[in-house]
Amino acid sequence: MKNTGKRIDLIANRKPQSQRVLYELRDRLKRNQFILNDTNPDIVISIGGDGMLLSAFHKYENQLEKVRFIGLHTGHLGFYTDYRDFELDKLVTNLQLDTGARVSYPVLNVKVFLENGEVKIFRALNEASIRRSDRTMVADIVINGVPFERFRGDGLTVSTPTGSTAYNKSLGGAVLHPTIEALQLTEIASLNNRVYRTLGSSIIVPKKDKIELIPTRNDYHTISVDNSVYSFRNIERIEYQIAHHKIHFVATPSHTSFWNRVKDAFIGEVDE
């Protein structure tokens, strides 16, 4: 069975096993008449781990409606694993049978407003975190224009449902199924004593809601967006909302369901 002209981009990390898989898969795709295209692909195959999938997402974050993703892992199982490195024949066969079906997950939109009028816009697949560079961060949390609390602590992170299994989970946040289009705000080492209090638990807000963080001091803050880190001074406010666009994965018989991904990543085999 031959392909009908699908354009595919392969993105791999520099590890020897990933590079070996990259060359082998590239050869198989060419032999089956797929088109390799690294600017306007139909499908992007990430080879490596979850970090590589995040890099692939950010490379094509402005083409999300036109691109579908596949995660091919060359190491231990990751959350975004669709195929393992020994399943290349299976992957190529499923690509030949592909009908365009997709599985979609929400994406986080982040707007950083600076006091000089600049606005920096980011998208995150997993989460966006903010910390103060050298001391306790103090920031007002506003939900839909209504002041909620004044936070004091190391920082805050806002995660998507798929990102709820990443940094958010290590902070004690809840795991959300991606069909629940919501954001989760989780504290990083909040300061709670007789003088200062915060809610002390994660906040889950629905798709239509907007979370604003307003730092009370104008010094440097570090903002992490997935696997990228930025430093800003004189932040006026930061807005977080579910983005209009979603990330789409190729829906094949091998696409692992969300709860199976959670089980494989964190629990493993369950004894009967």
UniProtKB/Swiss-Prot annotation:
Cofactor(s) for this UniProt protein: a divalent metal cation
UniProt subcellular location: Cytoplasm
EC numbers, comma separated: 2.7.1.23
Keywords, ordered alphabetically: ATP-binding, Cytoplasm, Kinase, NAD, NADP, Nucleotide-binding, Transferase
Gene Ontology MF annotations: ATP binding; metal ion binding; NAD binding; NAD+ kinase activity
Enzyme class: transferase
Active site: 50
Entry-linked InterPro entries: ATP-NAD_kinase_N (IPR017438), ATP-NAD_kinase_PpnK-typ_C (IPR017437), NAD/diacylglycerol_kinase_sf (IPR016064), NADK (IPR002504)
GO biological process, one term: NAD metabolic process
Similarity-based family: Belongs to the NAD kinase family.
Function of the protein: Involved in the regulation of the intracellular balance of NAD and NADP, and is a key enzyme in the biosynthesis of NADP. Catalyzes specifically the phosphorylation on 2'-hydroxyl of the adenosine moiety of NAD to yield NADP.
Protein name per the record: NAD kinase
Lineage: Bacteria, Bacillati, Bacillota, Bacilli, Lactobacillales
